[in-house]
Amino acid sequence: MTDNKIKMPVWGPYSKKYMGISKIINELADKGARYDFSVHPTLWNSSTPVPNVTVPSNYHLWNCKNDYTFYSYRYELMWKDEVYADISFSKADDDAYLMRCEIFNNTSLSQNCILNIFASLEFPHPTYCEVSVPSGAILKTANDYVDYSYAVARPWDEENPDGMFKGMFADKEFYLGKGLGDRCENYHVHFLNLKPFGFESGDKVSYKFDDNDIKNPIIAVRYKTVTDGDAEFDMNGKTVVFAHSDELNIAYIPYMSEFTLESHGKAGIEFDFLCVVDESEKENITCKTKAQPYMPQIETKVLENGHITKLTYDTVDKPFYILTNNKNTRERKLDSGCLEDALINRLSNGDHTYDELRETFSASFQRKHSDDGFFHNSLIKSIFIEPNTSHVEYVMLSQSEPKQLSSEEYEAIYQNAKKGSKPASFNKAGEKYTLSTEILKSTLLTNVVYPVYRHGENVIHHTPGKRWDSFYTWDSGFIGMGLLEFSPKLCQYALDMYLCDDTNKDFCFLLHGSLVPTQFVEYLELLKRTNDKESLAFLYDKAKLYYEFLRGRNHASTVAKFNNGLLTTYDYWYSHCGMDDYPAQVEMMARKSQKYTCPCLSTAQIIRAGKIMKMVADSLGRYDDIKIYDEDIEYSTKALNDLAWDEESGYFGYTEYDENGNVTGIMRTADGENFNKGMDGVYPIVAGAVEGERKKKLLEHIKNPNEMWSAAGISAVDMSASYYFDDGYWNGNVWMSHQWFIWKTMLDNGEADFAYDIAKLALDMWKDETDFTYNTYECFGIATKRGGWFHNFGGLSAPICIWANAYFKPQTVTTGFDVWTDYQKTTDNSANIKFKYFGNCDKYTMIITLSDKVKYVAYLDGQKIDFNERNKGSLEFTFDKNVKGGVLEIKEDQE
């Protein structure tokens, strides 16, 4: 990542463990260290869970400014809203944040509460491998190779997943936490019969060492074998053997300044490091598992109105401070990296007799010690709250010694930081969606973690939910588009995270999970919202690298392996579409026919990506590229219609192939039913790749309440299909993500009424669920219209915020995929938009939402035009396809 990247703040909600605030430790950036402050309010002698970010834990995101100078969450102590705590973090200065906790007692009884503040220095793993070598020895990680190759090529050889260098994997038992070998999942390409590195004759790795003055040098190699037998290699003509070892072991090979290890195919192996050392000192190389330096020196001063605790760490430049504002402060310690190892009733009792937090109350249970680590626990005990009142506590969290302030001064910091954090100002018709969309907005913004490793550095990453500690290609595009509703800068940050320039030989975009290339629609939406297109031009060549991979033209891509215009990403992940249990996909895996099967969604998405790149190229004057995009679009559009259409069902189908790559038909059930009746089967309409009667049939399927248009929205699977069931993950559920693609497509087709129906049903269902539970779920059951799976999910549910803004938030301009805007100039009661139309549908719709306080008149290139006012202030313009663009002007009607 280069210096022109947008920077994230060093303080933020970055913990992967417990909700609170974290500080990134810059001096330990190579280790990925962060400092966590976690806050746990609880009723005395209760079972309120600690704020574990990976499981339901009673807290709900409530508010967040897009610069992270203020955010808050609600902690339920007695459901629902009987007793709760509103916890916020307010930036005081560059080195300090104020934690404010207001506990509300809405019961008729007095309450006794406790406030726990936990502080911990966190690393990706609590232990690491310390390597010591003799003075003058040369130590090199195995990943510092000149070249690394497999005799049998992997489809991902030049598109390595998870931001890794080729062959690299993460493992705390290895030096620097990284090893070299083959740990990429490959069960989805079982037909390639891939073997671990070293188990295939001809696997190679090359190294080069600088000149040195070591008298009798040899090379110590730390390794482990991953199959039975000894691993045997040719080393520049000499045979070297690495004896079988299930544990990491050291072998010694002859010294050569440059050499290649070429496998004889005897056993699989993983390498850790190489060390050039004098033979007489080889036994002085040691590898020890050491605890990370997470233990602090603790100094506490008792003040008139609280405690100040100083936590000093050997490897951190400056100490951390916790300053409370209540004389009823105590402190405890937990010798564990897992707060759940502490008994919940000990955490909720502030008496000193309960300070042995892991001590059980019965010999029937053992002490728990799940992880190594250490938490310092400042607690404010015996917070008495009268009925129907609230109580506020302030705690300053700092890396410079804070001064104790008055409650009034603390409150002023809070109020100042909170400015500008108000929810979106919807028009009256949309006000009922305020709470549910604000919770989702806050979830999207705070689902951000550190560290995630990306090609040599640890980065801050916006994740679908904090239970996923990794990149996610298709989720990230939706995260970025959700962030765009509040912060174009954060959208750009998320997008640029996933793109690469041509200096990266290990991958041309970040790949993890289903390869649904949502970065293209993310780029399009960001460009349309950005009037200065040149400021984002640097992303074009990066996006083009990505696109060329999707066409099978760079980085050894196999996406175009059928050589007929149909495209598949099944060589890169078991799911091409993100719909894990989509029936055709499940059946393909059961048949083990991935090699001979091609879905439709990948081709459709890549056609749409080509159309987007064509629009961007036109804007930037990259006219030579347009011809390439046009040829690609025509080639794949024809292939879909010639090879994948099933007239009998009126859906497109998974094409199946023989050994020679010839299409033999489409995938069917034993009874002859098209196995692709569902989202994949209608996806060519998203690409604009189907016309006439075929398009009509697809629209009928999507709109039919007995097929795809369920009571909860658009079903992933046709409900009349023999393979539909109502309790799957995607099968039987409605997700917002692919439904968003259909919604945009309805705008492309001038289907404004149905587009609104999609958005309105989703918003109402989301409101009912989130207003009731305060949770933001992944999907909604068709049978129940209730949310399910992960509870603090952002990612693929981001379209909820997009729909709410599109129809109810003034100054929001929305189009389908086929409309490009050169600029969007808006106020609450006016708009001036220059646009171009690139599609070929009979009609298309644009939505411009302005204030509901006035009446409007509209002009296209100076000529007055009609529009539909969907809701007061939400104006829909449906144009004939012959309208290729112009300047749309909307003004207050003075008549």
Where are these regions (language model features)?
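Extended glycan-interaction surfaces of carbohydrate-active proteins
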Residues: 427-468, 490-509, 557-598, 641-733, ...
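Extracellular glycan-targeting catalytic surfaces
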Residues: 372-373, 383-385, 395, 462-467, ...
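Alpha-helical scaffold segments in carbohydrate-active enzymes
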Residues: 442, 497, 542-556, 612-615, ...
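Active-site-proximal structural scaffolding
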Residues: 94-96, 267, 350, 354, ...
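C-terminal capping/lid segments that line or modulate ligand- or cofactor-binding pockets
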Residues: 1-36, 519-530, 535-539, 646-657, ...
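Structural helix-adjacent loops and short alpha-helical linkers that scaffold large soluble proteins
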Residues: 427-433, 467-469, 483-496, 527-544, ...
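Aromatic-rich carbohydrate-recognition surfaces in CAZymes
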Residues: 469-476, 480-587, 599-607, 678, ...
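Terminal accessory carbohydrate-recognition/targeting modules of carbohydrate-active enzymes
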Residues: 1-432, 789-790, 808-895
